[in-house]
Amino acid sequence: MQRGKFITIDGVEGSGKSTQIDFICDYLVTKKINVILTREPGGTELGEKIRTLLLSTDIQSIHGDTELLLLFAARNEHIRTKIIPSLEKGDWVLSDRFTDASYAYQGGGRGLSIERITQLEKWVLQDFTPDVTLLLDVSVALGMSRVESRGRKDRIELETNDFFKRVRNSYIERSKQFPKRIKLIDASKTLEQTAQQIKIILQVL
């Protein structure tokens, strides 16, 4: 049986991931491809509990290193018990965020050591990597205006604009570092125009 493809989709808050995830799933279904939709943090019973902890506004402060370790603990469980088994069955897996988010949010946003993140990545992922990463890019101003329209914010969404500017810059640097895997998509365009950019990438997978 042919191994499935692993697609990740990432970007700052308000980049439109949820809408484009729906488009990707619908597109793959038309191609008779079985797709497993998952997310980080989350995707497993343990991961979802960690997600609740990390996003809860009831917790006033979490040390950056603690946050990073919890994310990689959830990621390890996610990879071992859901992503790899699904790929080995021939399913395609689409994950809302993956390791690039740790470099952007914890590395760029929080200012944690990139070397430390890389060490955790090598330990947890080993040689495992997505087939393609769709990086939806919007300005922080546009992204946060979309977040404001959704109503109540989680712990991460309550961060400052400067935090999200650092996150965005880190994402862009990652796309320059890994241009073959990370496809930078202008998500400030209409939903249809953004989806068309994604469709072109999916057609050559």
Swiss-Prot record:
Key word Iron present in the record?
no
Gene Ontology CC terms: cytosol
What does the similarity note say?
Belongs to the thymidylate kinase family.
- Quote the PANTHER family the UniProt record gives: THYMIDYLATE KINASE, UMP-CMP KINASE 2, MITOCHONDRIAL
Residues that bind ATP: 11-18
Q: What does this protein do?
A: Phosphorylation of dTMP to form dTDP in both de novo and salvage pathways of dTTP synthesis.
Task: Return the broad EC class.
Answer: transferase
Task: List the residue ranges forming a coiled coil, or say none.
Answer: none
Q: Write down the superkingdom of origin.
A: Bacteria
Species the sequence originates in:
Ruthia magnifica subsp. Calyptogena magnifica
- Gene Ontology process terms (BP): dTDP biosynthetic process; dTTP biosynthetic process; dUDP biosynthetic process
The reaction(s) this protein catalyses: dTMP + ATP = dTDP + ADP
User: CDD domains from the entry?
Assistant: TMPK
The record's listing under Gene3D superfamilies reads: P-loop containing nucleotide triphosphate hydrolases
Q: Name one GO molecular function term.
A: ATP binding
Protein name, entry field: Thymidylate kinase
Q: EC number(s) for this protein?
A: 2.7.4.9
